[in-house]
Amino acid sequence: MIPFLSLKDVTALHGEEINEAVTRVVNNGWYLQGKENERFEENYAKFTGTKYCIGCANGLDALIWIFRAYIEMGAMQPGDEVIVPANTYIATILAITENGLKPVLCEPKPNTLEIDDDLIEGLITPKTKAIAIVHLYGRIAYSEKIGEICKKYHLKLVEDCAQSHGCKSYDGRVTGSIGDAAGHSFYPAKNLGALGDGGAVTTNDPELASVVRALANYGSQKKYVFKYAGRNSRLDEIQAAVLDVKLKYLVGDNLHRKEVAHYYYEHIHHPLITLPDLLPDDQNAYHLFPILVGEGQRDALHAYLEQNGVGTVCHYPIAPHQQECYAKEEWNNPQLILPVTERLADEELSLPIGPSIKAEEVKEIVKLINQFK
């Protein structure tokens, strides 16, 4: 069996150092808000090229705290609008709606799978306060045009970097340093994954950093003094220690992903399958390798590969605007039709890719795909 991703194998790549890090924390006896957090936050800020990194419980919380902080700072208020890609994972939209903000869904480009920057300006209203870009699948979503739109309309640019650890923009900036603030997820399956949940906010804004740090600690900037109504959303010391180990190997692990991706690009040849545009290497961290399967054959290919011992996953089979939880929301008009987003939900299939996959496994996957009938 070739798994979609074996977390056991991924962890084993750096297992000795990870075990040493966990043991160090256990023996130290300090499990929250200690030196491990300080060290990781400092190192991850350096990696992303930002001044501030604030660890938190998970990637969803990271995004929630960014928007909540902007509300506390007076930059936004409930009812304001945030433009967001319609084909994102639902967490991006949850972070917006959890703060009483209104998501305005923007279609992606079918050849890149990222937000269509040609459509953004037409969605802006007097209530628009931010654009949230999502570097989906590890592919860069930022463009010079998006930056210009933000400047023209004085909009905040928020990055969802849950899938883009180590990805760079066309101008060389690492994701997480491009916008005004960025949310990161360290879910175990990510390019930089913990041994449980974890997240972080990166920014160059000192006020935002201070408010986010307080919100993630019950709303407190001083012990037993609560300026905001926050929540317990802290990154624990064990996860911080593990992440600091894995951060050292992120560039090398991403390089392996790129080698696998290039093999897919060069050797997958099937009339039903379309691959997204090949980006310059630095502009794709290859968190996932999405393919589009036409003529209603996505599920058949998924089942065929499963039967032949290959795990694949659909990202994502139900678009956010079609989810039951948002069925009655005012912003989610029943007549809302997003043909590109809905097509991607019907056709996308992610192939195995990761730092532990072997060359012979990749070759077997390609052979099976090309033989699919």
Sequence positions of predicted segments:
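Conserved coil-to-alpha-helix start sites within the AMP-binding
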Residues: N87-I93
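Hydrophobic residues in well-ordered beta-strands that form the structural core
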Residues: V84, L105, L157-E159, T203, ...
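PLP-dependent aminotransferase class I/II
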Residues: K8, N37-E42, F47-I54, L60, ...
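Active-site phosphate-binding strand-loop segment of PLP-dependent enzymes
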Residues: N111-A194, V201-T202
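Helix C-cap/helix->beta junction micro-motif
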Residues: N99, K152-Y153, N308
